[in-house]
């Protein structure tokens, strides 16, 4: 590979664009490989003899963590000073969702950190 005539920001392997550092796509049937970010082009012949290996790794069945109530999004996030209407505990976690049309406010879901009771408020 002769990159002597190429003015580049840094020196790189053929896997990366020498101008912007992006990963270059794999060579295809075209005569050149072009960077999808900056448009830098390199002749496909420069890739001759280069070996490309790929592998796919799958997680074993059953290795994913089971979802429990404490791990859901309604139990994560900030806690505000709000009294639970069911148990009277002071302190509720909250998260927001856009449940209605985009020109209306969000819906705030409050979850009691003590009894897990959930309330909602349209803002």
From Swiss-Prot:
Zn-finger region bounds: TFIIS-type: 80-120
User: Where, by residue number, does Zn(2+) 2 bind?
Assistant: 84, 87, 112, 115
Indicate which residues form the motif Hairpin: 103-104
Keywords of the record, alphabetical order, are: DNA-directed RNA polymerase, Metal-binding, Nucleus, Transcription, Zinc, Zinc-finger
- Residue intervals of every C4-type zinc finger in the record: 17-38
Q: Which GO terms describe its biological process?
A: termination of RNA polymerase I transcription
Q: Which GO terms describe its molecular function?
A: DNA-directed RNA polymerase activity; nucleic acid binding; zinc ion binding
Indicate the segments annotated as coiled coil, or none if absent: none
Cellular compartments annotated = Nucleus, Nucleolus
Q: Which InterPro entries is this protein grouped with?
A: DNA-dir_RNA_pol-M_15_CS, Rpa12/Rpb9/Rpc10/TFS, Zn_ribbon_RPA12_C, Znf_TFIIS
Query: Could you name the domain of life of the organism this protein comes from?
Result: Eukaryota
Q: Which Pfam families match?
A: Zn_ribbon_TFIIS
Q: Which GO terms describe its cellular component?
A: RNA polymerase I complex
- Tell what the record comments on domains: The TFIIS-type zinc-binding beta-ribbon domain contains an acidic hairpin motif (residues Asp-103, Glu-104) that likely coordinates the nucleophilic water and magnesium to cleave the scissile phosphodiester bond and release the mis-incorporated 5'-ribonucleotides.
What quaternary structure, including any partners, is listed in this protein's UniProt entry?
Component of the RNA polymerase I (Pol I) complex consisting of at least 13 subunits.
Summarizing the function annotation, the protein's role is: Core component of RNA polymerase I (Pol I), a DNA-dependent RNA polymerase which synthesizes ribosomal RNA precursors using the four ribonucleoside triphosphates as substrates. Can mediate Pol I proofreading of the nascent RNA transcript. Anchors into the Pol I active site to monitor transcription fidelity and cleave mis-incorporated 5'-ribonucleotides.
Q: Which family does it belong to?
A: Belongs to the archaeal RpoM/eukaryotic RPA12/RPB9/RPC11 RNA polymerase family.
**PANTHER family listed in its UniProt record:** DNA-DIRECTED RNA POLYMERASE, DNA-DIRECTED RNA POLYMERASE I SUBUNIT RPA12
What name does UniProt use for this protein? DNA-directed RNA polymerase I subunit RPA12
Tell me what organism the protein belongs to. Answer: Bos taurus (Bovine)
